Design a protein with these regions (language model features):
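Conserved hydrophobic alpha-helix
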Residues: 56, 104-108
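Catalytic-loop of the protein kinase fold
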Residues: 110-120
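Conserved hydrophobic "DFG−1" position in protein kinase catalytic cores
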Residues: 14-17, 68, 80, 125
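Activation of the activation-loop gatekeeper triad in protein kinase-fold domains
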Residues: 134-139
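Conserved structural core of kinase catalytic domains
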Residues: 28, 42-46, 57-101
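ATP-binding glycine-rich loop module of kinase domains
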Residues: 2-47
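Conserved protein kinase catalytic/activation segment
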Residues: 122-132
Length: 141
C-alpha cells in the first residue's frame, strides 16, 4: 500500500482489490474533535460519498467504481483511474477538458448533486474521458 495523498479529510492510498489496482480512501480520526462527533461525521461522509458516486454514474458521468465500503473503519475501496489530474494539463486539451468539466457540473446540478469541492485536483483525464473523483463533501440538493 502506497500513500498517494494526505488530505484534510482523508488519506488516499494505492492498493489492490481482488487482484486489481485500487484506491483506498481512509478518513482518519481527528483528535481535536469529540470522539462521538468525529465518528459520526466520518461515517456519514463515507456513506454519503459512496452513495453519491454510484448515483452520479446514472447521469452518464464517469466516476470510479466503488468496490467496497467499510463504515466502521470509514474506509472505501474504489477503482484506480490511471490518468492525469486536470491541474497538470498544459496542452491544447485544456480547453476541451474545461468544456467537458462544465458539462459535467451542469449535469450534476441539473440532477440535484452539489460536488462541494470542485478543483482541478478532483478531475482525472483518461484517454478522452473526464472522471470526477472525491465526492467527500458532496450533497444532494
Amino acid at each position: 500500500m502506497k500513500l498517494l495523498k494526505k488530505g484534510a479529510e482523508a488519506d488516499i492510498y494505492l492498493t489492490s482489490w481482488n487482484g486489481k489496482e485500487a484506491i483506498l480512501k481512509i478518513r482518519e480520526k481527528k483528535d481535536y474533535l469529540n470522539p462521538v462527533l468525529d465518528r459520526r461525521i466520518r461515517e456519514q461522509r463515507t456513506i454519503r460519498e459512496s452513495g453519491i458516486i454510484s448515483n452520479v454514474k446514472s447521469f452518464g458521468i464517469c466516476t470510479p467504481l466503488v468496490y467496497f465500503v467499510d463504515t466502521k473503519k470509514c474506509e472505501m475501496y474504489m477503482q484506480y483511474i490511471e490518468g492525469n489530474l486536470v491541474r497538470d494539463l498544459v496542452n491544447p486539451r485544456v480547453i476541451k477538458t474545461c468544456e467537458e468539466i462544465g458539462r459535467i457540473v451542469g449535469t450534476l446540478h441539473k440532477n440535484g448533486v452539489m460536488h462541494g469541492d470542485l478543483t482541478t485536483s478532483n478531475f482525472i483525464v483518461m484517454k478522452d474521458k473526464v472522471f470526477v473523483i472525491d465526492f467527500g463533501l458532496a450533497q444532494k440538493t
